[in-house]
């Protein structure tokens, strides 16, 4: 929700100023297209989440479209032509998915290089493989590994400072537990000390028994 709100605020400002005239949103899955369209509608931006590659022209009532990365890869030339036709803001949601396949990365670059503005979003600015993420700058660290360079990062500490998230606390518990088994034997164990899975489970049940 945080990334979406930020991106739509940027889109609203750019549309209002005339810097862009259309918005293209690219996301990993079909259902996310509809989520983006619903969120955009709440701020007065009309996005078509049902746009298909065979459709051709976009309806005049829409400010833009929502696409999947796979949809772009299926016809990059079509989406490049659309991007060329109007001053376009392209929002690339979860951009790290753009490196899922070589063809996807190539298609995204082909389709959206002409965009007036590009906004790439991700909460995961890295990949477990070495596939490059489209439109992302990399810089080698001391070990020689390439690290992505964000234009702007907003982390947990920032959100905590701004009061938009609650602090996460991990509580440690300890204590001596005593219980009787079904056979009538009395067992004692202390939470926080090394125990077998079975003993730990029984000790927790005892501790949480109202």
Tell me the role of every PLM-derived stretch.
Residues 4-9, 19-42:
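Conserved Walker A/P-loop ATP-binding site and its immediately adjacent core
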Residues 12-16, 38, 110-113:
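Short, well-ordered alpha-helices that flank and scaffold nucleotide-derived cofactor binding pockets
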Residues 20-21, 86-87, 114-117, 164-168:
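Short glycine-/polar-rich loops that comprise or flank the Walker A/P-loop
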Residues 24, 65, 91, 119, ...:
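Hydrophobic/aromatic beta-strand patches that form the interior of the parallel beta-sheet core
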Residues 30-32, 70-73, 96-97, 124-128, ...:
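Conserved nucleotide-binding/hydrolysis micro-motifs of P-loop NTPases
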Residues 41-77:
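Inter-Walker segment of RecA-like/P-loop motor cores
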Residues 69, 81-120, 124-127:
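SF2 helicase catalytic motif II
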Residues 130-210:
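Interdomain helical connector at the RecA1-RecA2 junction of SF1/SF2 helicase-like NTPases
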């Amino acid at each position: 929700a945080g990334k979406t709100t930020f991106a739509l605020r940027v889109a609203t400002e750019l549309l209002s100023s005339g810097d862009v005239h259309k918005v293209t949103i690219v996301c990993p899955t079909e259902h996310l297209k509809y989520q983006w369209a619903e969120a955009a509608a709440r701020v007065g931006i009309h996005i078509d989440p049902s746009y298909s590659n065979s459709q051709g022209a976009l309806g005049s009532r829409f400010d833009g479209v929502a696409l999947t990365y796979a949809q772009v890869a299926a016809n990059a030339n079509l989406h490049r032509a659309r991007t060329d036709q109007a001053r376009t803001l392209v929002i690339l949601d979860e951009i790290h998915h753009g490196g899922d396949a070589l063809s996807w990365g190539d298609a995204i670059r082909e389709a959206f290089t002409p965009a007036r503005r590009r906004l790439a979003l991700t909460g995961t600015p890295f990949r477990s493989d070495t596939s490059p993420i489209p439109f992302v700058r990399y810089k080698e660290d001391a070990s020689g590994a390439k690290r992505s360079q964000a234009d702007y990062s907003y982390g947990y500490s920032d959100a905590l400072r701004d009061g938009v998230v609650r602090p996460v606390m991990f509580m440690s518990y300890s204590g001596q537990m005593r219980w009787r088994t079904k056979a009538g034997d009395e067992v004692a164990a202390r939470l926080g000390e090394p125990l077998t899975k079975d003993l730990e489970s029984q000790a927790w049940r005892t501790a949480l028994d109202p």
